[in-house]
């Protein structure tokens, strides 16, 4: 056998045609990784890079519209959940990349690595509360349509420290959401990255 009984459609599914081919495969689709499909945004980026906690109302509305479309696709295909990346604070991306590079080079004891580790939380903290508030607003806006469609919303463990939510913010977000519809979606690879880069303990 396959060793598993279902698949997740991830954001590499860039067109309705790709999604249909996957849906016609031998295994059912259990979940969809927002946005599905993942077209090119008029903003000149992949739609998965649109920020669901953006303070730019036009970008936010575009991102929410795609998430609503993913809910509709999940309901149509009989998938039980969609997985959400809630977005990011638009600072710290270069520093996060530097941390990854230094870790892969085995330089986690270097001054450069330690300085970068300290710098990201400091920069992030300046605007994280506004972005977290927007992320909560996003989930609350998606909750009604998801409930009506019989689809769950999973807020995924983040990969980089500049992203929303971190583990403490996740707890705050979930406290503001309907637990019958919204839950925590654990990505073991993302959590392991956080532990290895020294952000948190993967337990």
Regions picked out by a protein language model, each given a short descriptive name:
Residues 1, 15-18, 62-73, 135, ...:
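Short, acidic/polar
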Residues 52-186:
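Active-site acidic/histidine proton-transfer and metal-coordination neighborhood
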Residues 1-15, 76-81:
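Catalytic domains of carbohydrate-active enzymes, especially glycoside hydrolases
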Residues 6-20, 39-40, 90-92, 160-166, ...:
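Acidic-and-aromatic substrate-binding clefts and catalytic sites of carbohydrate-active enzymes
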Residues 12, 45-54:
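Alpha/beta catalytic barrel-like cores
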Residues 29-39, 84, 184-187, 203:
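Non-cysteine beta-strand/loop elements that form the S-adenosyl-L-methionine
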Residues 23-26, 48-50, 100-101, 171-173, ...:
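Short, hinge-like loop/turn segments at secondary-structure boundaries
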Residues 16-33:
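Aromatic-lined substrate-binding rim segments of carbohydrate-active enzymes
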């Amino acid at each position: 056998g396959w060793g598993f009984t279902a698949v997740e459609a991830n954001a590499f599914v860039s067109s309705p045609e790709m999604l249909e081919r996957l849906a016609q495969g031998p295994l059912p689709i259990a979940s969809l990784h927002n946005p599905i499909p993942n077209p090119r945004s008029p903003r000149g980026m992949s739609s998965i890079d649109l920020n669901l906690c953006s303070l730019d109302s036009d970008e936010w509305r575009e991102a929410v519209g795609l998430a609503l479309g993913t809910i509709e696709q999940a309901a149509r295909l009989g998938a039980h959940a969609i997985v959400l990346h809630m977005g990011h604070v638009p600072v710290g991306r270069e520093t996060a990349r530097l941390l990854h590079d230094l870790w892969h080079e085995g330089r986690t004891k270097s001054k450069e690595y330690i300085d970068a580790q300290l710098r990201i939380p400091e920069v992030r903290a300046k605007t994280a509360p506004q972005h977290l508030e927007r992320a909560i607003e996003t989930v609350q806006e998606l909750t009604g349509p998801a409930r009506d469609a019989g689809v769950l919303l999973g807020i995924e463990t983040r990969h980089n420290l500049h992203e929303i939510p971190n583990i403490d913010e996740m707890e705050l977000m979930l406290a503001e959401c309907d637990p019958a519809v919204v839950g925590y979606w654990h990505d073991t690879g993302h959590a392991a990255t956080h532990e290895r880069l020294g952000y948190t303990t993967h337990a």
